[in-house]
Curated annotation (Swiss-Prot):
Residues reported in the UniProt entry to bind tRNA: 14, 64, 66, 112
Alphabetized Pfam families for the sequence: Pept_tRNA_hydro
Purpose: Hydrolyzes ribosome-free peptidyl-tRNAs (with 1 or more amino acids incorporated), which drop off the ribosome during protein synthesis, or as a result of ribosome stalling.
Keyword tags: Cytoplasm, Hydrolase, RNA-binding, tRNA-binding
Subcellular location: Cytoplasm
GO biological process, one term: protein quality control for misfolded or incompletely synthesized proteins
Enzyme class: hydrolase
GO cellular component, one term: cytoplasm
Name of this protein: Peptidyl-tRNA hydrolase
Length: 185
C-alpha cells in the first residue's frame, strides 16, 4: 500500500496560492485519473483506490500546513503504511518556479509541513516530490506563498503538474526513489 499526500492549507482563501502547490498537484492527478477525495477522516480529505493492483491512499491534510504530520501519521498508522511507501507533494521556495526534484529522505529544508511530518512519523525517511515556487524577490515570504501564480508562472506550474502525473504513476508502480531521482531530477 502507498500513500500520496499533497500539502496545502484548507479553505477557499488559500485555494490557488503558491503554498497550496501540493493540493493543486494532487487535484491535477485526481482529475486526470477521474478520482475524487470522498472521505473525511484522519484530519484530511482522502480516498483509497486500487491502481494497477496496488492499494493507494490519496490524502490532502486539512490541518493547515504546519500540522500536516498529524494527518499523514494518523492515516499511515491506521493502514500500517511504512514511511518508505509515503510520497509527500510539497512546494519548495529554494527552487525555480515549476522545477521538480525528488528526494528519498532528508531534513525539512525549513518547510514547516515537512518538519511536522518528520516529527509525527518519527523519521526523515519518506519520499518527497518537491515543486519549486521560487523565493520572493521583493516580498515577504508569507505574502509570497499566500498569493496565486501569475499567468507566466502558471504555465510553468501546469507543466510541472503534468510531469507529476508520471512521477506519481511511477511511484505507485513501485519504482524506487533512485529510479525516480535519475529520471526526473
Amino acid at each position: 500500500m502507498k500513500i500520496i499526500a499533497g500539502l496545502g492549507n484548507p479553505g477557499q482563501k488559500y485555494d490557488k496560492t503558491k503554498h497550496n502547490t501540493g493540493f493543486m498537484t494532487m487535484d491535477h492527478y485526481l482529475d486526470k485519473k477521474g478520482l475524487t477525495l470522498n472521505k473525511d477522516k484522519f484530519e484530511g480529505h482522502w480516498t483509497k483506490e486500487k491502481i494497477n493492483g496496488e492499494d493507494v491512499i490519496f490524502l490532502e491534510p486539512q490541518t493547515y500546513m504546519n500540522e500536516s504530520g498529524r494527518s499523514v501519521s494518523q492515516i499511515a498508522n491506521f493502514f500500517k503504511v511504512a514511511p518508505e511507501d509515503v510520497l509527500i507533494i510539497q512546494d519548495d521556495m529554494d527552487m525555480p518556479i515549476g522545477k521538480i526534484r525528488i528526494r528519498a529522505n532528508g531534513k525539512s529544508g525549513g518547510h514547516n509541513g515537512i518538519k511536522s511530518i518528520i516529527r509525527d512519523l518519527g523519521t526523515e525517511k519518506f519520499n518527497r516530490l518537491k515543486i519549486g515556487i521560487r523565493h520572493p524577490k521583493n516580498a515577504t515570504v508569507v505574502s509570497w506563498v499566500l498569493t496565486p501564480f501569475n499567468d507566466e508562472q502558471q504555465k510553468l506550474m501546469d507543466d510541472a503538474f503534468d510531469t507529476s502525473v508520471d512521477i506519481i504513476d511511477d511511484f505507485i508502480a513501485g519504482r524506487d526513489s533512485q529510479y525516480l531521482m535519475n529520471k526526473y531530477n
